[in-house]
Amino acid sequence: MYLGTQFAARTDSDYETFKQLGVNNINGFPETPHQNWTVENLIQYREKVESYDLKLDMVQLPLSSKDIDSRVKSGEFYNILTGISPERDYEIERICKIIEMCSKAGIPAVKYNLNIIGIPRTESESGRGGAKLSTFRWDKADHDAKDTYAGKVSEDVFWERIDYFLEKVVPVAEENKVRLACHPHDPYTPPGYKGVTRVLGTVEGLKKFISIQENDYHGLNFCQGTVTEMMDNPGEEIFDVIRYFGNKDKIFNVHFRNIKGSKLSFTEVFPDEGSINMYEAIKVYKEVGYKYMLSLIHI
């Protein structure tokens, strides 16, 4: 277990800063658009990271946390979650190709999201030292917000689309020995919000997710902050959830984030002031033998 970052380097000097701050491992973002990724330019990117005495632990697949409407405009993959064929089959084929290229380029893991409505938040609130805190208050959210490009997506439909994706992608990951780390839905929202029932927004949903296409290379980008946002009493509940997924070796990356509050009403805060005892959390990650990055994010 070690500290890492997923902060996207703005210039080459940021890589130097990472090293100066004691960060040795990163989740990277190749500089070439994903449509143009090749084994050669992925190797070049990894070697560039390594030239700063850093290790490239994983890269982000073109399945981000952005809402699907934004991805439609930007050209990022979205049909995997609309279920439209043959377009989704092309996207899945490209994801499989990227996994193969990462393996050949010496990149051991990838992270991704299966997100339709993005990361809902309400108005920011002020925190320590005047910091603006990312906030979600369900009682202040627009409960009548319109559906996304994806339209109505029920629980059963969402699971069907996830299963379709995993059935094709997980065997490729296993064959190429590349870990797939999926981020939960941030935050939990009541069923039908913006037309979607978010199946990866509960602990039970995450348990079901890892049981689909059970495989050593199929697991979670375990965002501790997001998981605590699913809980009524996160300060007590989170540790057993870490144990559950950690003992199954399903945690491939940790977003080491804290919140103040609980399900449907919280702010993201500095690590030392939230509802979770972060020192105790680290001890649990050690207890279960977690061996990858702890990334401080959203601060």
Task: Locate the predicted segments by residue.
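Active-site acidic/histidine proton-transfer and metal-coordination neighborhood
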Residues: Y78-G219
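Short, acidic/polar
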Residues: A8-K19, I92-I99, E237-Y244, M278
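Conserved small/polar residues in nucleotide/adenosyl-binding loops
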Residues: I297-I299
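Active-site-proximal loop/turn and secondary-structure-junction residues that shape catalytic pockets
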Residues: A9-T11, T32, P62-S65, L114-G118, ...
